[in-house]
UniProtKB/Swiss-Prot annotation:
It is found in: Cell membrane. The lineage of its organism: Bacteria, Pseudomonadati, Pseudomonadota, Alphaproteobacteria, Rickettsiales. It is a multi-pass membrane protein. This is Putative sensor histidine kinase NtrY-like. Keywords: ATP-binding, Cell membrane, Kinase, Membrane, Nucleotide-binding, Phosphoprotein, Transferase, Transmembrane, Transmembrane helix, Two-component regulatory system. It comes from the Bacteria. It comes from Rickettsia conorii (strain ATCC VR-613 / Malish 7).
Length: 599
């Protein structure tokens, strides 16, 4: 029963229907969540419910997609064991995350409700009311005082207006008697101060807003808010046009600061209380992102952890595939695994591959010996061919011209034939000996740019009908090499290029040195006839040539020298005409080889 359930559950999880269903549900619930959040009257419980459903859907979808991805790539780099471990890590991360999310949101909601308890709100509101009542009481008292002073001044205004000194004295008496910090009588028509108490600040109608003056004209008692530390009241004197009384009383700075602090704290508290739903929503969204991040971290950790387990087996499988493809130089690193069963398997595998490599090397040596035997036979055959006309010519000389030399022209022709075929023999034997007995390179530090440039200049003097061009991206370069062999390589390549240009009117040969990172390239290009397509793949093999001169071992020698110098020889035809030969040396490998030979 359990196996049947597991099998069907696995097939259901792997089906596209489930993925499509989850993706559709994710889109629908995401849109619904956005709609609920955007409503003016937000229901926090509904929003949290939608967010938790979104989290659950996304986590399940992530697990299913991960399982689907690894199943799809099962035949490539992943293994079934790795897939199972990664899926297990995903489930272990997803299920607790959902549970923790639900409880975290619930407890966060309880904590927030405790912060904004009704008792705290009541205390803050009462504090604001007390502070505002204090200021209101001061304003009420000042209003009553302003009305009383205005009444007194209105009764005495006719007598006081003609005696400014008496007006000022009376105004000061009123201010002292009623505990006013300032008292000013203003005339709007003349825009002047008629009288003021001693402690009053200079003031004009320009500093009083026009709408307040209009209210005062209507008989209202108006508050003038020009200084936060002072309460001022403006009133028009009865029966006197354009005459106004302004009284003021200072409020203690500590009280003002306390009132401002109380109002500020209450405003901030109420603002935070109004924003609490948004804060809870943001917290929930942040928690969802953290949960998804944890899921991805769990998957990543599962991949890394599984790779550590499966990596040794994968290396062994890869090495086996390389051996199957014919690479007998592959070895698995024994020092990277523990001394367990896998370590024993590594040791046995390496020993087996070394034995196979040794046997193959012995076989190659035997085949090479047979090849050299064929070479010797071919060389002997090539030597015998020019010897036959030499022998015949010598016999003819002996029989026909031994008594005396009468026909001089014919005699010279025979001699030229002997010389020509003798030179052929000399060239054949020289090339064979050079190829068969090429000495090991003796590495010394040489200036490569100077070496190549002077070879090019020397060939230019010998072939003035060919346009030579030399370029280098460095002025000089110290190169570990056997200068004699490198010289031989360049001469061989340039001679081949010159021979391919023979018969052309505008021959051109370019030699380029390019140093880049840990590699240096020497490139030779020409506009000659190039290589025949059927021979370009085996141009560096022995006895492959398109020339009537020599045995075709020149490029074979070049290849051997280049490989001895940790280089790669690349031969190709140009798109337009001619050939391009690129020699790329690995400087790091070359330095290591030179150091090994010095030891």
């Amino acid at each position: 029963m359990l196996s049947y359930l597991k099998q069907n559950l696995h097939s259901y999880f792997s089906s596209r229907v489930l993925i499509f269903t989850l993706a559709t549900a994710a889109i629908i619930f995401a849109c619904a969540t956005f709609y609920v959040i955007s409503l003016e009257s937000k229901n926090f419980s509904t929003i949290i419910g939608f967010l938790l459903v979104d989290l659950a859907i996304f986590l399940i979808l992530g697990v299913v997609l991960t399982q689907k991805f690894f199943t799809k790539n099962n035949n490539n780099d992943s293994s079934k064991l790795q897939n199972r471990i990664v899926i297990a890590f995903s489930l272990v991360a997803a299920i607790p995350t959902i549970i923790v999310s639900v409880f975290s949101v619930y407890f966060f909601n309880l904590s927030v409700q405790a912060w904004f308890d009704k008792k705290i709100s009541t205390v803050l509101d009462q504090s604001v009311i007390v502070a505002e009542s204090y200021i209101a009481e001061h304003k009420l008292q000042l209003k009553e005082t302003a009305l009383a002073v205005a009444e007194d001044l209105s009764d005495m205004y006719y007598d006081l207006i003609h005696n400014p000194a008496l007006f000022t004295k009376t105004l000061n008496t009123e201010a002292e008697m009623r505990s006013l910090d300032e008292a000013i009588v203003l005339n709007k028509s003349t825009n002047t101060i008629v009288a003021n108490s001693y402690l009053s600040f200079s003031l004009s109608f320009a500093t009083i807003p026009a709408h307040l003056i209009k209210k005062a004209d209507l008989g209202e008692l108006v508050e003038v808010k020009s200084d936060p530390t002072k309460i001022r009241m403006l009133i028009k004197l009865k029966e006197y046009n354009d005459v106004y009384l302004l009284v003021g009383r200072l409020v203690d700075n500590k009280i003002i600061d306390h009132v401002d602090a109380t109002n500020g704290a209450a405003a901030e508290y109420n603002s935070l209380k109004n924003e609490i739903d948004n804060i809870q929503i943001k917290f929930s969204i942040m928690f969802i992102f953290i949960a998804l991040l944890l899921l991805f971290v769990a998957i990543s950790f599962g991949v890394i952890f599984t790779a550590k387990i499966v990596k040794p087996i994968k290396k062994l499988v890869t090495a086996t595939d390389n051996v199957k493809d014919g690479d007998l130089t592959v070895q698995v690193p024994e020092n990277e695994v523990d001394k367990d069963e896998i370590g024993t398997l590594y040791v046995a595998f390496n020993r087996m591959i070394k034995q196979l490599s040794r046997q193959q090397r012995d076989l190659v040596i035997a085949q090479r010996a047979m090849a050299w035997s064929d070479v010797a036979k071919k060389v002997a055959h090539e030597i015998k061919n020019p010897l036959t006309p030499i022998l015949l010519a010598s016999e003819r000389l002996l029989k026909k011209f031994s008594p005396e030399i009468k026909e001089r022209v014919e005699f010279e022709n025979y001699l030229k034939m002997i010389i020509r075929h003798t030179n052929d023999i000399k060239n054949i034997v020289s090339e064979f000996v050079l190829f068969a007995r090429l000495p090991a390179p003796k590495f010394t530090k040489s200036e490569l740019v100077y070496l190549v440039k002077h070879i090019v200049e020397a060939r230019k003097l010998l072939n003035d009908h060919i346009l030579y061009k030399f370029e280098s991206n460095v002025e000089q370069f110290d190169f570990m090499c056997d200068a004699t062999q490198i010289n031989q390589v360049m001469i061989n390549l340039l001679k081949n290029a010159e021979e391919s240009i023979e018969g052309r009117e505008s021959g051109k040969i370019e030699v380029t040195i390019d140093v880049k990172d840990d590699f240096i390239s020497v490139i030779v290009t020409d506009n000659g006839k190039g290589f025949p397509p059927e021979l370009i793949g085996k141009a560096t093999e022995s006895y492959v040539t398109t020339s009537s001169k020599g045995m075709g071992v020149g490029l074979a020698i070049v290849k051997r020298i280049v490989e001895e110098h940790c280089g790669i020889l690349d031969i190709a035809n140009r798109e337009a005409e001619g050939a391009i030969i690129d020699i790329k040396f690995d400087l790091k490998e070359l330095d290591l080889k030179a150091k090994r030979l010095e030891m």
